Amino acid sequence: MKHKTWFALVFLLACLNGSGQSKVEKKDLMLPEVLTSNQGKRIRNAKMWIKKRRPEILQLFEDNLYGQVPKEVDSIRFNLKKEEHMAMNGKAKLKEIQIDVYRNKQSVTINLLLFIPANTSKPAPVFLLINHRGKDNTDPTRTLKSEFWPAEEVIARGYAIAAFHVSDVAIDHKETYHEGVLRLYPEQMTMGNGMKTIGAWAWGASRVMDYFEKDRDIDRSKVAVVGHSRGGKAALWAGAQDQRFATVISNDAGEAGAALSRHLIGETILDINTNFPHWFCDNYKKFNSNINALPIDQHMLIALMAPRAVYVASASEDKWADPVGEFLSLKYAEPVFNLFNLKPLPAPTQPAVNVPVKSSNLGYHLRTGIHNLTLYDWERFMDFISVPVK
């Protein structure tokens, strides 16, 4: 409690001084070293990172936080249920795709919505939203429109936009979450590092990626996976363990998402495991009251995306998600991107509200307002992926 109070005081004083970022140094946070192997060996180049350290860190996240994401399936089928060539008054083509995945005589169906710009002669880059909110946010008829998934605005910029609902793979409820994809992998339920809800949603995003690889209208080399809040946690994990995603976008993902757990602002490991015991693997609960025993922190998750592109978005009034901790995760992941000769963010400290910053492969903004996914956020995401990745 003393540590929590001290960090909160530092954060408050920093805000009063006109800066959103606390002055806590990396050494004060006692973060695990991202460029030191489990055997204590320093990682000095990209080859060492890819061969040695990246697999270690991925395994640590599987074993201690998200659980393993099973890869094996008996079969997967893609069925185009509907195709409308004059969607959005002729500005887009709509596809509704049914993705059926089979294993152990069980199956799960993911219903994918996909809008593609009509005025393009080449495969389109696509944003994939992991939607954990109401399905009315992704209304395919466009009778209902939502900034949470602003399909018209994205199409107007020349990008495709897609979404699936998380309930197709795992219902977000502690009593029924296992009734989806986990029927295909019942062995996960009894394992300390078994996949739970967040891992299941990431698994679903990868099955959508399987489909994108088959659709000639989509540029499979330019797929951005997007998630807000708990969906942001899933997007980050999907991007970490599935390197086919070219860009990973986290919006207000907070604890066990983009925010450093050791920053001790807002939601804690104990909070999240108490309120949402079905989200993460059982092993994560070991760290409820012993955070410094956790061999990872979220800067290491973001580092797993290197050399691909990562964007983190925060909201000024969303203290529960710890905007400063989210920014610091990006900053402390930069040494890994440096191994690939990629430039750091052009901001040593958290930027001012509504002043986005980006390099070729890293981006961040702090939006005015509450915990939400808005058109302002989407506009910044589109600006970001328009930057050539070097």
Residue spans of the language-model regions?
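Bacterial Sec-dependent N-terminal signal peptides
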Residues: 1-23
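Glycine-rich active-site/cofactor-binding loop and its immediate structural neighborhood
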Residues: 87-141
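Primarily recognizes the serine-hydrolase "nucleophile elbow" in alpha/beta-hydrolase
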Residues: 134, 138-140, 206-267, 290
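Mobile cap/lid helix-loop segments that gate and shape the active-site cleft of serine hydrolases
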Residues: 250-301, 326-349, 356
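Conserved strand-to-loop "acid loop" that flanks and positions the catalytic carboxylate
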Residues: 306-321, 367-368
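Catalytic active-site module of serine/aspartate enzymes centered on a nucleophile-bearing elbow/loop
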Residues: 367, 375-390
